[in-house]
């Protein structure tokens, strides 16, 4: 449909029809008996029959046949035959579940994540979906916040590269292309900066920090063509995001040039009343509309108030026209006016879901996401030894994270299922040992039942079996970690320990067999002090998805060499949170070897995290040569090449992530001690070496200056290249 046709359609629509295009309801409103819905949830929400029939989009309904029926029913009642948009959270997979986003960040391979997004789009579009609420590009520094699992980490550069790759993976070059869906980046903005890591909490950020650290990944997604943006629940410096005109109109639409559809998060507009920044629902509707929010998700704030506000002269109808037109434009870009079903096809849905190609990709992504945190020479495993797999994740299918409800945990391969195909049964034992969490821990999922409670007799039997297996083994592999319901939305944790019941088992196993390898399942950095001190090896595997167990076994046995590097610092303890490598310089830095009192430090713990950003070991070793610059001076229109030679100095083939950091040695505004500005993943055979070159331009040196503009200043800059954020391998150049 041409733009002029869309504008004519808009002109033919009544005010009520336009407002209802701005309403999104869940599938529950359409999949039940209409009378029951109207007298039940719709009545409770203040939604009338006309709203129900005219709502412009639907949340959480999928399946090709289901979608086609709902679309047919909807369009039969739609006076202008405008198709409905189908949206859902396809965060890291539809039916084939790829590693959680934080795990994908550990791959340092945005292109691989783009491939995963493309595969997810293929499955989702065949199921009738048009939009996915992904990627989440919020910067995360506080491990207490449960939603760190949905982010790719603490660094704005790394997040930006993943943001653009995932958007392109979902959308391709044209939304009409078969197998593609519209991408909605979220949550705009600063949601990851919630005070104390408590979900939905206040966000207070200086404009300097906000623009330098938090905004870049959103901008990268928008520049990549993201069709939609979702508002965040939080306030930004006192104003809720969903009614924040400065944030939505000035920054998002003005500075960033976003011209797509802006949707609220679930009930976020109405929640501004609870924030006490809106007097009532009508006031919230007025403010959100003036901020340019196009779709109200799952409340009647727009549907019940906007028409009246226009009639009373409180809001200008042209604001509603702007919102409605953007929604119509998105439907047109998806090709829905020509084909309202787009790619919905039950046969293709069946063929794509969990197909061998997607499973292979899920396994590859999982393998590349694993981070070897420690290895005292016990990995890869010697399969000739007696090995006991002991722990609650030994044969646990719940390894896909809480934000993957479109997938089925039964489709996930467990460690035991994979190991039984590789290890000699006569030399291998398996024991659960204990549940993931104790009976005293209460967890509530989205739709899941609360975890099973165990009797004292059951717990004792599980433990006894595990300890007997540990005594008889040469080495124990302990798959352990967080419960999947302990990470994700509304899962803030004040203490980021491995559950107590598992730590008790860990110590009891150590008492009978000191040769313990920990395989860690989790959706956030955890306090690993005890495990790090006592385990012989630690393999971080996050929530690895459908092929998690197969990937773990391949890495444990050395079939695949781990190559992941941390996208988020693991704090020494929770008292360090929030912590990140790119902190600002202070006036009293606590430099190595200093024993002075009046320094920026803790009395009881070190300043440094236990495991820093960018850290990751391998079954081989790598040497990085001194940094060589092709010139020591650079003008603003030039570039400097920074080179190192990376050599595999070990006995196994492997991949290393070579990381480029830059420090501004002097500026009018205090700058970070270092900032990631590039990375390269290189694969090397034993003894092989490769030159890696990074090209540095003036753009890499820009920051948010005192005058409110982005730019650089002349002066010296230190270039550091190594395999983690702790590298000091450096050279200096001058920007003229």
What are these regions (language model features)?
Residues 1-702, 711-725, 732-736:
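Glycoside hydrolase catalytic-domain context in secreted enzymes
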Residues 705-707:
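Flexible, membrane-facing loop/turn or short amphipathic-helix motifs
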């Amino acid at each position: 449909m041409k733009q002029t046709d869309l504008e004519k359609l808009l002109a033919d629509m009544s005010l009520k029809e336009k407002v209802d295009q701005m309403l999104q309801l869940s599938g529950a409103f359409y999949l039940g008996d209409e009378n029951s819905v109207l007298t039940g949830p719709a009545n409770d929400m203040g939604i009338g029959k006309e709203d129900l029939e005219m709502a412009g989009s639907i949340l959480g309904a999928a399946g090709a046949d289901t979608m086609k029926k709902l679309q047919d029913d909807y369009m039969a009642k739609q006076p202008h035959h405008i198709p409905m948009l189908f949206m859902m959270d396809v965060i890291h997979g539809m039916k084939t579940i790829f590693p959680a986003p934080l795990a994908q960040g550990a791959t340092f391979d945005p292109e691989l994540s783009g491939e995963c997004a493309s595969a997810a789009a293929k499955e989702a579009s065949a199921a009738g979906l048009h939009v996915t609420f992904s990627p989440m590009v919020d910067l995360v520094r506080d491990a207490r916040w449960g939603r760190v699992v949905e982010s790719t980490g603490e660094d704005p550069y790394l997040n930006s590269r993943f943001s653009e790759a995932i958007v392109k993976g979902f959308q391709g070059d044209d939304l009409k292309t078969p197998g593609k869906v519209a991408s909605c980046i979220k949550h705009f903005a600063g949601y990851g900066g919630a005070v104390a890591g408590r979900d939905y909490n206040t966000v207070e950020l200086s404009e300097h920090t906000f623009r330098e650290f938090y905004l870049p990944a959103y901008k990268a997604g928008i520049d990549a063509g993201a069709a939609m943006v979702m508002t965040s629940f939080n306030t930004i410096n006192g104003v809720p995001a969903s009614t924040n005109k400065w944030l939505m109109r000035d920054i998002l639409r003005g500075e960033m040039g976003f011209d797509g559809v802006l949707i609220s998060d679930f009930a976020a507009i109405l929640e501004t009343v609870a924030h006490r920044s809106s007097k009532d629902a009508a006031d919230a509707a007025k403010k959100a509309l003036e901020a340019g929010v196009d779709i109200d998700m799952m409340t009647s704030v727009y549907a019940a108030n906007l028409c009246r506000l226009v009639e009373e002269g409180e809001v200008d109808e042209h604001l509603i026209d702007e919102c409605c037109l953007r929604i119509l434009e998105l439907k047109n870009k998806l090709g829905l006016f020509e084909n309202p079903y787009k790619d919905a096809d039950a046969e293709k849905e069946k063929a794509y879901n969990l197909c061998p190609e997607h499973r292979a990709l899920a396994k590859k992504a999982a393998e590349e996401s694993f981070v070897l945190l420690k290895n005292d020479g016990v990995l890869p495993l010697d399969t000739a030894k007696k090995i006991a797999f002991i722990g609650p994740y030994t044969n646990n299918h719940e390894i896909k994270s809480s934000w993957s409800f479109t997938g089925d945990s039964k489709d996930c391969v467990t460690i035991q299922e994979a190991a039984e195909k590789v290890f000699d049964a006569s030399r291998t034992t398996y024991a659960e040992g204990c549940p993931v969490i104790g009976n005293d821990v209460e967890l509530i999922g989205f739709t899941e039942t609360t975890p099973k409670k165990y009797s004292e007799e059951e717990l004792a039997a599980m433990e006894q079996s595990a300890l007997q297996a540990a005594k008889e083994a040469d080495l124990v592999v302990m798959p352990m970690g967080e419960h999947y319901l302990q990470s994700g939305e509304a899962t803030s944790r004040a203490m980021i320990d491995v559950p107590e019941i598992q730590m008790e088992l860990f110590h009891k196993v150590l008492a009978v067999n000191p040769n313990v390898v920990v395989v860690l399942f989790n959706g956030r950095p955890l306090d690993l002090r005890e495990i790090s001190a006592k385990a012989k090896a630690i393999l971080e595997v996050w929530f690895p998805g459908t092929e998690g167990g197969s990937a773990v076994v391949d890495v444990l046995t050395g079939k695949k060499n781990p190559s992941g590097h941390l996208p988020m610092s693991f704090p020494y303890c929770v008292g360090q949170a929030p912590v990140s490598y790119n902190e600002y310089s202070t006036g009293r830095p606590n430099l190595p070897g200093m024993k002075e009192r009046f320094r920026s430090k803790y009395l009881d713990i070190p300043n440094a995290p236990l495991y820093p950003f960018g850290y990751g070991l391998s079954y081989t070793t790598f040497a990085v040569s001194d940094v060589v610059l092709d010139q020591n001076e650079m003008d603003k229109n030039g570039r400097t090449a920074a080179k190192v030679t990376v050599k595999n100095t070990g006995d196994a083939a492997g991949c290393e992530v070579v990381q480029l950091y830059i420090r501004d040695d002097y500026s009018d505004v205090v700058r970070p001690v270092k900032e990631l500005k590039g990375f390269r993943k290189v694969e090397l055979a034993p003894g092989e070496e490769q030159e890696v070159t990074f090209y540095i331009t003036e753009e890499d040196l820009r920051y948010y200056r005192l005058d409110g503009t982005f730019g650089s200043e002349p002066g010296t800059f230190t270039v550091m290249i190594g395999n983690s954020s702790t590298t000091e391998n450096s050279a200096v150049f001058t920007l003229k």
